[in-house]
C-alpha cells in the first residue's frame, strides 16, 4: 500500500501488468499499415525507414521522469504563489480575522478534492490544479499565523523540508532506505492510524484541548513525540513516492499519469512541511 490513495492506485495497475495490453493492441494496426505501405515503397525508401531511430517514450506517449518533474514543479509553483498571496492577506493585522476561514476553507477543500482525485476513475487536470490552489491557501494562512507566533520558524521549516526531501531522495537512490511490498503494507497501516489520530486531534484543538494544540499540548514530551512521528512518516512517504514514480516510468504507463504522480508528490511534500512546522514551533517553547 502506498502512502496515499494516488500511489496505491498506480501501484495496483503496475502489479496488474501495467499497460502491456495497450502495446499489443496498438501494435497490430501499425503492422498492418506497414505491410500495406511496403507494397508502394522502393528499396531506398525502405532502407531510410529502417535506419531511423526507434520512437522514444515522448513519441509514443509514454510516461517519462521529465514529465513528472516538470508537472511537479508546476504544481509546486502554484502552491507557492497562492500561498504567498494567502500569507500577505492575513499578515495585515486588520485582516488577521481571515486566518481561520482561509485555513479551514483550504484544509477542508483540499481534503475533499484530494479524495475525489484519488478515487476518480479518470485523471482530471483541473481538479489537480484546484487542489494545489487550495493547498496554497491553507499553507499560506497557517504559515503566516505560525510566523507571527514564532518569528523565523517558517524559514527554518522551509529549509528543513527541502533538506529532508533531498536527503530522502539520495537515501532512496543509494539504497540506504529501501521500499518493499512489506514496508508498504506496514506503512499503509501506520498511515491509517495516524490519519484517524490527526482528525481527532483537529477536533480536539478546536475544542480547546491542549491550548488549541490538541492532544499532547504545545511543548510536552508527548506533543513533541507526536510531531517527530509525523515527520518520520511524512519523510518515508517521500521514499515510497520516489519508488512509485520509478516503477511507473519502468512500466511505461501513459503520459497522463504524470499529473497523478506529481499530485502525489505535492501531497507528501506539503504534509512534510506542516509536520516540520509544528515540530519546530513546539521546540521553540
Predicted regions mapped to residue ranges:
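A hydrophobic alpha-helical transmembrane-helix feature that marks the membrane cores
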Residues: 1-285
Amino acid at each position: 500500500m502506498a502512502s496515499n490513495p494516488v500511489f496505491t492506485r498506480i501501484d495496483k495497475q503496475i502489479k496488474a501488468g501495467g499497460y502491456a495490453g495497450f502495446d499489443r493492441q496498438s501494435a497490430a494496426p501499425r503492422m498492418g499499415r506497414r505491410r500495406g505501405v511496403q507494397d508502394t515503397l522502393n528499396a531506398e525508401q525502405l532502407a531510410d525507414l529502417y535506419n531511423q531511430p526507434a520512437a522514444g517514450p515522448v513519441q509514443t506517449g509514454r510516461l517519462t521522469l521529465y514529465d513528472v518533474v516538470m508537472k511537479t514543479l508546476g504544481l509546486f509553483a502554484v502552491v507557492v504563489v497562492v500561498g504567498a498571496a494567502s500569507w500577505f492577506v492575513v499578515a495585515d493585522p486588520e485582516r488577521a480575522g481571515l486566518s481561520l476561514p482561509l485555513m479551514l476553507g483550504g484544509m477542508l477543500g483540499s481534503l475533499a478534492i484530494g479524495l475525489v482525485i484519488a478515487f476518480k476513475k479518470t485523471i482530471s487536470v483541473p481538479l489537480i490544479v484546484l487542489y494545489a490552489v487550495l493547498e496554497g491557501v491553507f499553507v499560506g494562512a497557517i504559515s503566516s499565523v505560525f510566523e507571527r507566533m514564532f518569528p523565523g520558524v517558517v524559514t527554518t521549516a522551509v529549509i528543513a523540508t527541502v533538506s529532508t526531501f533531498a536527503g530522502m531522495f539520495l537515501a532512496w537512490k543509494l539504497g540506504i532506505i529501501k521500499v518493499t511490498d512489506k514496508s508498504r503494507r506496514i506503512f499503509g497501516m501506520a498511515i491509517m492510524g495516524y490519519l484517524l489520530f490527526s482528525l481527532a486531534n483537529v477536533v480536539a484543538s478546536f475544542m480547546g484541548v491542549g491550548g488549541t494544540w490538541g492532544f499532547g499540548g504545545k511543548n510536552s514530551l508527548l506533543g513533541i513525540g507526536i510531531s517527530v512521528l509525523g515527520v518520520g512518516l511524512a519523510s518515508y512517504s517521500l521514499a515510497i513516492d520516489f519508488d512509485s514514480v520509478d516503477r511507473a516510468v519502468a512500466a511505461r504507463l501513459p503520459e497522463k499519469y504524470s499529473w497523478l504522480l506529481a499530485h502525489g508528490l505535492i501531497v507528501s511534500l506539503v504534509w512534510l512541511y506542516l509536520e516540520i512546522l509544528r515540530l519546530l514551533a513546539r521546540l521553540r517553547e
